[in-house]
Amino acid sequence: MLRGARSHLPASVAPAAVLAAALLSSFARCSLPGRGDPVASVLSPYFGTKTRYEDANPWLLVDPVAPRRDPELLAGTCTPVQLVALIRHGTRYPTTKQIRKLKQLQGLLQTRESRDGGSQVAAALAEWPLWYGDWMDGQLVEKGRQDMRQLALRLAALFPDLFSRENYDRLRLITSSKHRCVDSSAAFLQGLWQHYHPGLPPPDVSDMECGPPRINDKLMRFFDHCEKFLTDVERNETALYHVEAFKTGPEMQKVLKKVAATLQVPMNSLNADLIQVAFFTCSFDLAIKGVHSPWCDVFDVDDARVLEYLNDLKQYWKRSYGYTINSRSSCNLFQDIFLHLDKAVEQKQRSQPVSSPVILQFGHAETLLPLLSLMGYFKDKEPLTAYNFEEQVNRKFRSGHIVPYASNLIFVLYHCDNAQSPEEQFQIQLLLNEKVLPLAHSQRPVGLYEELKTHYRDILQSCQTSKECSPPKANITSDEL
């Protein structure tokens, strides 16, 4: 096992990191089922925001703690001086709303009329133990903690200078107030503890040198603090028109008819929301327990593509390119990231140590998607609508590929010693889910930091959250007073 982990590590990784990788890898394989993935579903690529991180990064199915060094990751005379990471929480339980819909669906199955030679799938589901409870309500599961510990170990091995023992007390952590994010940040710190102290049990997060994460919902849940978004999108009954239209469209009706026949229930007792929660239950059982749920047997790949598109439509219109405010509401977070990078540049120019070499921010898919949209990523030529499912089969915007559980967007700032000019001293790379993300303005894997700032000048200088998020004032005439 140690040889397997070592073969993926750069030569600069300390032996302690290798030992930690081996120990955590051993723990990972013993603690949860399904790691060899004999139960991996053919439906896994279509689970959208409920996708396991390892399904978006298949090399982790072989060894979940071995870092994969992207060949385009900058090396040589350029040294990383700061890392700013935006991280989605790890695998979670379904929400109470989803669990109640699942109970409703199971109730339909248990009261259906049994038929001779009936569906074995329906019979299996009627007997399927419903182990989800309302108390779970989106909380982080043990697999989600493992997602975070393993991510911490891989990043520490990939950037050993930044995650050095000396920098530990200078780590800066920010989190959403949601328990799944707070718990994810704590699990990440536990993974770092394993990196620094292989084999020793981690202390309580409050006792760690770097201190507990700081809650900042204005950054991590900016959408809750943007009145224009809340008015125009969140509370607007017509904002998700294309989502609702697709639910009653021909593609979804075909799935509905097929599922009703499989479950042996009247078609009018089902709707798109119940079908979707059944599909997600397949994903939850796989992600949380590593088991093949009988709910997976209800669907085939054609059904999965339709249900993935339904989920992507919601993400597109509520969190991405559907409405301008979706992305513009994240300006404050984007600017905050560049404030950290600017400060690191300034400190290096003054030959001072970088005060915050690693900044870790824990949020949601709803945090990452608007920011990536603001930066211009995963934008298709035509918008996703209720009526172009077939045309969008090869779309860029697939939420499961972009923001699975534990997804991460990482900004890495480098200082290059042999630069030909002052502008070339500082270069930057972006990583999405540990893979180099080409810069939007050049499609290159690395670029000058100042060039990136120039490309995003409008957002950095002109996007003011107070103005962007202010709903338009009502035009009241004197006759209306």
Curated annotation (Swiss-Prot):
Glycans are attached at residues 236, 475. GO terms for molecular function: 3-phytase activity; 4-phytase activity; bisphosphoglycerate 3-phosphatase activity; inositol bisphosphate phosphatase activity; inositol pentakisphosphate phosphatase activity; inositol phosphate phosphatase activity; inositol trisphosphate phosphatase activity; inositol-1,3,4,5,6-pentakisphosphate 3-phosphatase activity. Keywords: Cell membrane, Endoplasmic reticulum, Glycoprotein, Hydrolase, Membrane, Secreted, Signal. It catalyses: 1D-myo-inositol hexakisphosphate + H2O = 1D-myo-inositol 1,2,4,5,6-pentakisphosphate + phosphate; 1D-myo-inositol 1,2,4,5,6-pentakisphosphate + H2O = 1D-myo-inositol 1,2,5,6-tetrakisphosphate + phosphate; 1D-myo-inositol 1,2,5,6-tetrakisphosphate + H2O = 1D-myo-inositol 1,2,6-trisphosphate + phosphate; 1D-myo-inositol 1,2,6-trisphosphate + H2O = 1D-myo-inositol 1,2-bisphosphate + phosphate. One of its GO terms (cellular component) is extracellular space. Residues 1-30 form the signal peptide. Belongs to the histidine acid phosphatase family. MINPP1 subfamily. This is Multiple inositol polyphosphate phosphatase 1. It comes from Mus musculus (Mouse).
